[in-house]
Amino acid sequence: GTVTLPASKSISNRVLIVNALADSELPIENLADCDDTQSMVRILCSENSYFDVGHAGTAMRFLTAYLSRIIGKWVLTGSERMKQRPIRVLVEALNRLGARIGYLENEGFPPLEIYGSRLVGGSIDIPASVSSQYISALLMIAPYMEKGLEIRLTGKVVSSSYIDMTLQIMREFGAEVGREDTVIGVKPGEYRSVPYRVESDWSAASYFYELLAIAGEGEIILTGLKEKSMQGDSRQTVVWRKLGVRTCYEGDLVRLSAAKPEIDRLDYD
């Protein structure tokens, strides 16, 4: 049978921010239907100055950076649980780059009071162990900083594939970016408006690979996946081939078919 997979949440959230910075009226097709994405859509379309993201952690991080360069005074809050999630690393980084962000309740936690302004940018050191969403939040607004941005990641990088995803989306919207291992550079400029269709979620595809591997026969067609995907989970095809599931790309469709496993046991890190 044919399965319509959900859209990638990670790509949807990044494209929403970049598209808003581009001030684009062109459509974004196939957005993810999840709390984070829907919160961001609602807030980005709002004319209010007080925003509540609820439980949406990605929205809190990405919108903190986004609002810091939108002229005006903004309040960004969330659920009681969200108010217990630290955001100091991102806020301090933004303030060093020229933002004006303060805490309305507990130091280092939402809710935040944000005075949107023109950001100077420059060079900044960030611990590589922090959430990749902090790094992505900084990168996405970097073209609009007067000096651009250079991020030097200190220590062992985690979630590198999500940083690369952010950079790829930025390139697709016209940003000049570069990365050499732990140093990421973004030149000052602007995003251009482009129509965009979000690819399907490779992590959701894993369940159907598993079904075929267990069944040992049959085939399944999955929609909306790309062979040259920016999602790190797309590399799972190598693992599933060893476990007896072949992957064949046909345009924006992926045909999975059961085959003889190449191994009896898999140890994979």
Give the ranges of each region predicted by the language model.
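Short, structured segments at the rim of ligand-binding sites
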Residues: 1-269
